[in-house]
A protein has these predicted regions:
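Radical SAM/AdoMet-radical enzyme domain recognition
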Residues: 1-72
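Short, low-complexity, polar/charged sequence segments that are solvent-exposed and flexible
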Residues: 17-20, 56-59, 86-90, 210-212, ...
Length: 220
């Protein structure tokens, strides 16, 4: 993930410096004409003060960078429960808005189809001065029967390589064994197809028990 613009969070997460590798990857992808989405795992006390800087980096590298995706940390496998640090979607949104002058909490809303506690998003266009202007703040938000198809079309447009200077900021809170919510699982719009054709909600697919055992092992 693109977790910060300095090395400390990478040492905490990977045990080695990674920033230069990340920056080169962005440069090479941009040179190849690829659309780039920066994905950040948000860890309280490690990089939750870096969110605005990541958005600013994305703004400076438009139109190659099309989005920033924040994922509050989740815990899988065997992990000491007393050492877990949590951050919620509202806290992520508030920190981004506090750390970047062009971003406001009013710009964000939940996904059109998912449970409201699963995901969040906002869309921006860059004006002639370079500022990010919110598009979602003025758009009506309502449930729609064709929401899944609309989201797919919008992502194909937003994350396709182009000279269009637009940026999406969003994220998803993955569930783990300590905070699994069955109501969220029932509303999941991302299903993983098993070898036998069964559909498994995304968070359930990669969920592991407190002992580290996966409920649905294997890729498919």
């Amino acid at each position: 993930g693109f977790d910060a613009l300095h090395e400390t969070p990478y040492y905490a997460k990977y045990g080695k410096p990674m920033l230069e590798t990340k920056l080169r990857a962005v440069e090479n992808a941009a040179a190849a004409g690829l659309a780039i989405v920066l994905v950040c795992c948000v860890i309280p006390g490690e990089n939750d003060g870096e969110l605005g800087g990541i958005v600013e980096y994305a703004r400076q590298h438009m139109p190659a960078v099309k989005g920033v995706y924040f994922q509050p940390i989740s815990y899988f496998g065997i992990y000491p429960e007393d050492k877990m640090r949590r951050i919620t979607i509202p806290e992520v949104i508030r920190k981004v808005s506090e750390q970047h002058p062009d971003v406001s909490v009013q710009d964000f809303g939940p996904g059109s189809y998912d449970h409201s506690q699963c995901s969040f998003n906002a869309a921006y266009a860059q004006d002639k001065t370079g500022r990010l202007m919110p598009l979602t703040r003025f758009a009506p938000r309502k449930a729609a029967e064709d929401a899944v198809h609309r989201v797919r079309r919008n992502l194909q447009t937003a994350w396709t390589p182009s000279a269009r200077r637009t940026l999406t900021i969003g994220g998803m809170a993955f569930q783990d064994a300590w905070n699994i919510d069955l109501m969220r699982v029932k509303r999941c719009s991302i299903q993983i197809i098993q070898k036998d054709g069964a559909l498994v909600p995304l968070c359930s697919k990669y969920l592991s028990g407190c002992n580290g055992a996966k409920l649905f092992p294997g890729i498919g």
